[in-house]
């Protein structure tokens, strides 16, 4: 079997086609990452006019800071809850739509609506519903004797930001899961049904293994989403409180850099977060992807 390769009339045309993407990558990704790495090794004054090379002192100070370590473990817990809860809920809804015959179009449209809402707006929406004094959901919980006040209860605050973050990401996950389920040949599903496999068994024995590559892709995407893109939700919903119970690494970087004007500490934290995400992604590609290959 021979494979054909595209032939360009000019030897410079391939480089010209790739150049815009390379420029965007360098300007918006590589350059800022390099700047963060450089500032993490400096002691910079709040106005950025002068700096002094201090080596790894900023990193040493980080890991002796109890507030930073608390934010680190809060980030791990928050990211795990957002990632796995979002994937499970989205997969459940996608599986339901895959089996629904009547009204499936309306159901699909309804599931895609949260993706059109900005993260900060999603947070404000759920703040209204969970408002301790006038919220519809808190009023319902009060009827059962449950007192809700996420401004004073750290567990409730964590639940609120996780819930809002998952709700915002459901549409994205749902779209990929539903497309993956729809791509499974109907002949395989019908053959399994003829062999006596029920809907639940067909899903776990047939559908789930076949959509494993998509599940792995969404695992990586949701992990990055939980680490970085949930900042507007946390900022609008709890501002990292109460008592830093919902302060993640990305929010602490913002607070140190833009509120505390400690550019060196903020840069060091961003470098640690960057390498943490890189390590987790590499581990996933190395050990998880090998388990999603199928013939």
Curated annotation (Swiss-Prot):
Record key words, sorted: Cell inner membrane, Cell membrane, Membrane, Transmembrane, Transmembrane helix, Transport
Domain of life: Bacteria
Primary location class: membrane
One Gene Ontology term from the biological process aspect of the record: transmembrane transport
Cited InterPro entries: MetI-like, MetI-like_sf, UgpAE/MalFG_permease
Assembly description: The complex is composed of two ATP-binding proteins (UgpC), two transmembrane proteins (UgpA and UgpE) and a solute-binding protein (UgpB).
Xref: Pfam families: BPD_transp_1 (PF00528)
Annotated compartments: Cell inner membrane
Residue intervals on the Periplasmic side: 33-80, 131-157, 229-262
Protein name listed in UniProt: sn-glycerol-3-phosphate transport system permease protein UgpA
Cytoplasmic compartment residues: 1-11, 102-109, 179-207, 284-295
Gene Ontology CC entries for this record: plasma membrane
Transmembrane intervals: 12-32, 81-101, 110-130, 158-178, 208-228, 263-283
PANTHER family, per the entry: BLL4140 PROTEIN, SN-GLYCEROL-3-PHOSPHATE TRANSPORT SYSTEM PERMEASE PROTEIN UGPA
Residues in ABC transmembrane type-1 domain copies: 76-284
